[in-house]
Amino acid sequence: MLALINRLLDWFKSLFWKEEMELTLVGLQYSGKTTFVNVIASGQFSEDMIPTVGFNMRKVTKGNVTIKIWDIGGQPRFRSMWERYCRGVNAIVYMVDAADREKVEASRNELHNLLDKPQLQGIPVLVLGNKRDLPNALDEKQLIEKMNLAAIQDREICCYSISCKEKDNIDITLQWLIQHSKSRRS
């Protein structure tokens, strides 16, 4: 019953008050970026994802907020595009495969290199440690440490441990994104 009331309230609010936000989703290949977009857009998880070549753009509406998501490929040849697609967005979402400990250092280096770009200063960042359902996945505390997130001082930074497969913490991730729909663009 409460869910029905919340849906009606969201629908009613959407008639009078709409927010739009734009975000860029980046991270190393196979971290789960496209899967994350599919889960928040449709609630569907699929094991059969094809790596993103270049970029994809998708609009997702949650309540009264329309989120324009730029999903950028994570292979080395596409990483030079990250900065271009991160300029002027409300938030940057950085996806990490929390179960692939061998790639965490490379992921940390790519994140810090990206955030060192002057055009991206001040844009809030949400770091998502995906695949928490797998054995030996880093938890939030370990991810914060291994990704050296405490060193990032020029912007708001948040970190959640999620599982797209199990849909763990997708709700709080969406809450964070919706909350930042009012963030100023740089």
From Swiss-Prot:
Binding-site positions, GTP: 29-35, 71-75, 130-133
Disulfide topology: none
Matches recorded under PROSITE patterns: ARF
UniProt keyword Cell wall biogenesis/degradation, yes or no: no
GO terms classed as biological process: anterograde axonal transport; autophagosome-lysosome fusion; cell division; chromosome segregation; late endosome to lysosome transport; lysosome localization; protein transport
Gene Ontology cellular-component annotations: axon cytoplasm; early endosome membrane; late endosome membrane; lysosomal membrane; lysosome; spindle
Keyword terms of this UniProt record: Cell cycle, Cell division, Chromosome partition, Cytoplasm, Cytoskeleton, Endosome, GTP-binding, Lysosome, Membrane, Mitosis, Nucleotide-binding
Pfam families with a match to the protein in the record: Arf
One example GO MF annotation: GTP binding
Organism domain of life: Eukaryota
Intramembrane residue ranges: 1-19
Record's signal peptide: none
Location in the cell: Late endosome membrane; Lysosome membrane; Cytoplasm, Cytoskeleton, Spindle; Early endosome membrane
Annotated family: Belongs to the small GTPase superfamily. Arf family.
Role noted for this protein: Small GTPase which cycles between active GTP-bound and inactive GDP-bound states. In its active state, binds to a variety of effector proteins playing a key role in the regulation of lysosomal positioning which is important for nutrient sensing, natural killer cell-mediated cytotoxicity and antigen presentation. Along with its effectors, orchestrates lysosomal transport and fusion.
Protein name, as recorded: ADP-ribosylation factor-like protein 8B-A
UniProt source species: Danio rerio (Zebrafish)
